[in-house]
Swiss-Prot record:
Gene Ontology terms: biological process: 2-deoxyribose 1-phosphate catabolic process; carbohydrate catabolic process; deoxyribonucleotide catabolic process
Keywords: Cytoplasm, Lyase, Schiff base
SUPFAM superfamilies on file: Aldolase
Protein name as catalogued: Deoxyribose-phosphate aldolase
Catalysed reactions listed for this entry: 2-deoxy-D-ribose 5-phosphate = D-glyceraldehyde 3-phosphate + acetaldehyde
Species assigned in the record: Shewanella pealeana (strain ATCC 700345 / ANG-SQ1)
Length: 257
């Protein structure tokens, strides 16, 4: 198997197969659950809006997809600085049955010089997850832009108890970049290599996936990237990976996240 095919195979096992669109329906989520059981093995998770968690759980149970985690989003997509609302949304997501919660860090507050609210919001949402769900923190690196801010958001999130740090919501102009990945995984290597990393949005093909995995290997070791420490947030990526593995049709034009 070529290196590119190996990267494609690995990326599928690390994927949070995502639909976070305003026009999502029960049927779209059911279809997503079926897609997550790919000819190359299951994706790590699906990522959906909280209201679809019950139908996703029912569907995964029906198709022997119990190993596929259900991730959802809170404080999404704007990363507001109201801690109480973020906590209520996170508690509700866990009550719905989410295995994983991707919460948006209040990145605009950080850009305005407020480091405290981000730390406190992540800490409170981590407490809301309890032992029932892991917490991924979306720092919106493409809007932060400044390497010092990307580093600070990563440090604050990890210090507050994040299980993963994630680049992007997929709802802004600049999503996952190798530059942000380098900064974020450097912070992980310095602070706690058990914390995971999730590039999201903009990872479109096996070549791009391989580049992100390469950064992980260089900074954290060849065996570091597993579903416990690395995820790709993506929707259109899966089609390309299956095509690379000669298990699916060629991708049809540009598709979102």
């Amino acid at each position: 198997m070529s290196d590119l095919k190996k990267a494609a195979q690995q990326a599928i096992s690390l994927m949070d197969l995502t639909t976070l669109n305003d026009d999502d329906t029960d049927q779209k989520v059911i279809d997503l659950c079926h897609k997550a059981k790919t000819p190359a093995g299951d994706t790590a998770a699906i990522c959906i809006y909280p209201r679809f968690i019950p139908i996703a759980r029912k569907t995964l149970n029906e198709i022997d997809g119990d190993d596929i985690k259900i991730a959802t989003v809170t404080n999404f997509p704007h990363g507001n600085d109201d801690i109480a609302i973020a906590v209520l949304e996170t508690r509700a997501a866990v009550a719905y049955g989410a295995d994983e919660v991707d919460v948006v860090f209040p990145y605009r507050a950080l850009m305005a010089g407020n480091e405290t609210v981000g730390f406190e919001l992540v800490k409170a949402c981590k407490e809301a997850c309890g032992e029932d769900a892991i917490l991924k923190v979306i720092i919106e690196s493409g809007v932060l832009a400044d390497p010092a801010l990307i580093r600070k958001a990563s440090e604050l999130s990890i210090d507050a108890g994040a299980d993963f740090i994630k680049t992007s919501t997929g709802k802004v102009a600049v999503n996952a970049t190798l530059e942000a990945a380098e900064i974020m995984m450097t912070v992980i290597s310095e602070k706690n290599p058990k914390v995971g990393f999730k590039p999201a949005g903009g990872v479109k093909d096996a070549e791009a996936a391989a580049e992100f995995l390469g950064v992980a290997a260089r900074l954290l070791g060849d065996d570091w990237a597993t579903p416990a420490t690395f995820r790709f947030g993506a929707s259109s990526l899966l089609t390309n990976l299956l095509h690379t593995l000669e298990l699916g049709d060629a991708p049809q034009g540009a598709q979102g996240y």
